[in-house]
């Protein structure tokens, strides 16, 4: 983990907790007490936190920003950031987007926060962030809370047509020439009901997922309008997807 990543996580801890001890930083980041104190000193010198005895406090004048605590530990984080930035450029002012769960989903929502677009989501970490940042238009899909995924799931057979959007952004555990695969069946089935009422389906997966097949087939390749992935994605799979009408964007 780089120094910049440590600093970001430390600031995220302060945003949630308001105060952290050196011991808590050591435990969370897996670093030595000396390194933890150095990080606190540097952030204190730059005015990003208030150094106190045996720890640090959040700067009260700054509005705390909520974000998943493990966001920077997500696999292929930098690539996912590029994917999210590219995806956010597709949406025009006044349009509505459906964003589902996961680290890439959160990164995309963060990119779109503050823009004149309506964000529809069942991912509570993202919804909390958008509300905290006072995003103008947020729709939270109702249903039963699923703790393992931090999402709400509506009962089987219920209508989700009220949540139609111009765009639907989703990801999964694997993408082949057959289509997109997801491992959580409840989540996948809830999202599948929306495929017929969204304008365009855009799949966001990092390059390590291309060619992988895991879980259930969520959507066939011919249902996918666009794929945004990394530059190291398997070119053979990408060619097969393009042949089926999928637009490919590598970042």
From Swiss-Prot:
Q: Which SUPFAM superfamilies match?
A: NagB/RpiA/CoA transferase-like (SSF100950), Winged helix' DNA-binding domain (SSF46785)
What GO terms fall under cellular component here?
A: cytoplasm
Q: What is the lineage of its organism?
A: Bacteria, Pseudomonadati, Pseudomonadota, Gammaproteobacteria, Enterobacterales
PROSITE patterns, per the entry: HTH_DEOR_1, HTH_DEOR_2
Organism name: Shigella flexneri
Question: Do the record's keywords include Transcription regulation?
Answer: yes
Regions recorded as binding DNA: 20-39
The answer to keyword Secreted applying to this record is no
Question: Start and end of every HTH deoR-type domain?
Answer: 3-58
> Per its record, how is this protein called by name?
HTH-type transcriptional regulator UlaR
The function of this protein is: Represses ulaG and the ulaABCDEF operon.
Primary localization class, coarse: cytoplasm
UniProt keyword list: Cytoplasm, DNA-binding, Repressor, Transcription, Transcription regulation
Q: Where in the cell is it found?
A: Cytoplasm
One Pfam match, by short name?
A: DeoRC
Name the domain of life.
Bacteria
In alphabetical order, the GO MF annotations are: DNA binding; DNA-binding transcription factor activity
InterPro entries given in the database record: Carb_Metab_HTH_regulators, DeoR-like_C, DeoR_HTH, NagB/RpiA_transferase-like, Tscrpt_reg_HTH_DeoR_CS, Tscrpt_reg_HTH_UlaR, WH-like_DNA-bd_sf, WH_DNA-bd_sf
- Entry's Gene Ontology BP terms: negative regulation of DNA-templated transcription
**PANTHER family reported in the protein's UniProt record:** HTH-TYPE TRANSCRIPTIONAL REGULATOR SRLR-RELATED (PTHR30363), HTH-TYPE TRANSCRIPTIONAL REGULATOR ULAR (PTHR30363:SF55)
């Amino acid at each position: 983990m780089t120094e910049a990543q440590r600093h970001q996580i430390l600031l995220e801890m302060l945003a949630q907790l308001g105060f952290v001890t050196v011991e808590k930083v050591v435990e969370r980041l897996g670093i030595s007490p000396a390194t933890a104190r150095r990080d606190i000193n540097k952030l204190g010198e730059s005015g990003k936190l208030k150094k106190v005895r045996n720890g640090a406090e959040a700067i009260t004048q700054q509005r705390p920003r909520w974000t998943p605590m493990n966001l920077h530990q997500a696999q292929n984080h930098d690539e996912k950031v590029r994917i999210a930035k590219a995806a956010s450029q597709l949406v025009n002012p006044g349009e509505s987007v459906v964003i589902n769960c996961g680290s890439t989903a959160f990164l995309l929502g963060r990119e779109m926060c503050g823009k004149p677009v309506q964000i529809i989501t069942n991912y509570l970490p993202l919804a909390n962030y958008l509300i905290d940042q006072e995003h103008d238009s947020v729709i939270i899909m109702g249903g039963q809370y699923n703790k393992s995924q931090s999402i709400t799931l509506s009962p089987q057979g219920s209508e989700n047509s009220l949540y139609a959007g111009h765009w639907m952004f989703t990801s999964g555990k694997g993408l082949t020439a057959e289509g997109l695969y997801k491992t959580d069946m409840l989540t996948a089935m809830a999202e599948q009901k929306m495929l017929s009422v969204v304008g365009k389906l855009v799949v966001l997966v990092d390059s390590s997922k291309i060619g992988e097949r895991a879980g259930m087939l969520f959507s066939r390749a011919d249902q996918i309008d666009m794929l945004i992935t990394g530059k190291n994605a398997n070119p053979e799979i990408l060619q097969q997807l393009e042949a089926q009408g999928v637009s490919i964007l590598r970042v």
